[in-house]
């Protein structure tokens, strides 16, 4: 039986999001086969293919330290003025997520949000074209484009809409990425 996964404050359900998966692979960092691996590729000058690191080596920071690795881009967090210890926890001790172009960790209430994975089709339908247009005003797309996105949206597809939840006020935030 596999041991319980470590808790990741900023990515509380890494199995559900697909960032961690069950595997008998031996971790490149600790040399143990613990039953789970990280499915992404960290930013590092070292060769760390998907499936080569276990969640425990991510959680305790040993993978980041040993391989000078980061699991998410720190720029969005630094640009938002998030405290350095939070940036370190997200980027060095939290599994990242795979996106079409570039993952972007969202911020609310001066803290990183919790990544929840792909937004559900139903919740995007409830937001509707107008709700998405308001959340992504910088896109300046016409209403028909937003409606087409709502009508065609499929979790795990292209475009991708990722959900983040604020750990303080509970507000849902979304990031949009596509090829």
From Swiss-Prot:
It holds the Pfam family UPF0167. Belongs to the UPF0167 family. The lineage of its organism: Bacteria, Pseudomonadati, Pseudomonadota, Gammaproteobacteria, Pseudomonadales. This is UPF0167 protein PA1536. InterPro entries: UPF0167.
